Swiss-Prot record:
The lineage of its organism: Bacteria, Bacillati, Bacillota, Bacilli, Bacillales. InterPro entries: Rhodanese-like_dom, Rhodanese-like_dom_sf, Rhodanese_C, TrhO, TRHO_N. It comes from Oceanobacillus iheyensis (strain DSM 14371 / CIP 107618 / JCM 11309 / KCTC 3954 / HTE831). This is tRNA uridine(34) hydroxylase. The gene is trhO. NCBIfam families: PRK00142.1-3. Belongs to the TrhO family.
Length: 323
């Protein structure tokens, strides 16, 4: 009967001291399983960061439970309706940091962070020629969708961002620097780091891209593409005024918003690919990934050696060619 119920996804975080993250995580996991939630929650000394899915009844109970705890009484939940769960399991894990920057001198967002810009003010900043808008997410997130004119840092993980800034300081110096991320948690710490590094005019999109897309006034305007999310949805829309596809198919460069993982489990690279190209290239991002005996696409579709060779010949490759 669950399939007839309405579900929703909660995205949230709170920087607040949690004295014993391990004990908190253990108890919190028990509670989440008890009420039927699924999702991923990280707990650290510095706070909590989570995405969970459940029925409206389950998620409402969870929000009430959290708001009844003095530490989280004012925590903001970003709510997205969905047809079902967006996770297969429930995980609550203790971590040294909520977002991994691994700074020698850590930043406490409760003490140092950039100015908060509400969606309307951020919308204005996007059109200001003296403002640099910096995407604080990873390159594959940017490639699926981003704010028009935003800078794309060439990074694979968040912890690489400070080094990228140091190498590209000339791009940012003397400008107002405005940064954004999915729900706001990365920017809380990153914008604080920018302030500590001596950037004088630093701001962040309050509540992140999710809040911007839900704002009734801006309606996601000036966002192009889709928003990458870290659950089974993979992507969600943001701009409610127009839809511009910015993603490009890994294989032919055509407009594409469909992410798949390379079929070589040792590679597992995320690539944008149409269904047609996924089949054509055996979901392998390189020849080596296409011909590996561990190729998951070949196993899933139970392809014979002859069938694999036929696919390869169609793209000018062969099982016998040197890798």
């Amino acid at each position: 009967m669950e399939s007839n119920q309405e579900y929703q996804v909660l995205l949230y975080y709170q920087y607040v001291t949690i004295d014993d993250p391990e004990a908190f995580a253990e108890e919190h996991l028990r509670y989440c399983k008890e009420i039927g939630l699924k999702g991923r929650i990280l707990v650290a000394n510095e706070g909590i960061n989570g995405t969970v899915s459940g029925t409206i009844e389950q998620t409402t109970a969870y929000m009430d439970h959290m708001h009844n705890d003095e530490r989280f009484h004012d925590m903001t939940f970003k709510i997205d309706p969905h047809e079902g769960h967006t996770f297969k399991k429930m995980h609550v894990r203790p971590r040294p940091e909520l977002v991994t920057l691994r700074l020698e001198d850590d930043v406490n967002p409760l003490e140092t962070t950039g100015e908060y810009l509400e969606p309307k003010d951020f919308y204005q900043a996007l059109q200001d020629e003296n403002t640099v808008v910096l995407d604080a997410r990873n390159d594959y997130e940017y490639d699926l969708g981003h704010f028009r004119g935003a800078i794309r840092p060439d990074i694979k993980t968040f912890r690489d961002l400070p080094d990228w800034v140091q190498e590209n300081k000339d791009m940012l110096e003397g400008k107002k620097v405005v940064t954004y991320c999915t729900g706001g948690i990365r920017c809380e710490k990153f914008s604080g780091w920018l302030v500590k590094e001596g950037f004088e005019d630093v701001a962040q999109l309050h509540g992140g891209i999710v809040t911007y897309g839900q704002d009734p006034e801006v309606q996601g305007d000036l966002w192009d593409g889709q928003l990458y999310v870290f659950d089974e949805r993979i992507s969600v829309p943001v701009n409610r005024k127009e839809h511009v596809i910015v993603g490009k198919d890994y294989f032919d460069g055509e407009p594409c918003e469909r992410y798949v993982n390379c079929a070589n489990p040792e590679c597992n690279k995320q690539i944008l690919a149409s269904e047609e190209n996924e089949h054509k290239y055996l979901r392998g991002c390189t020849h080596e990934c296409r011909v590996t005996p561990r190729n998951l696409y070949v196993k899933e579709h139970e392809l014979t050696g002859t069938q694999v060779e036929e696919r390869l010949l169609a793209i000018g490759e062969s099982l016998t060619q040197e890798v």
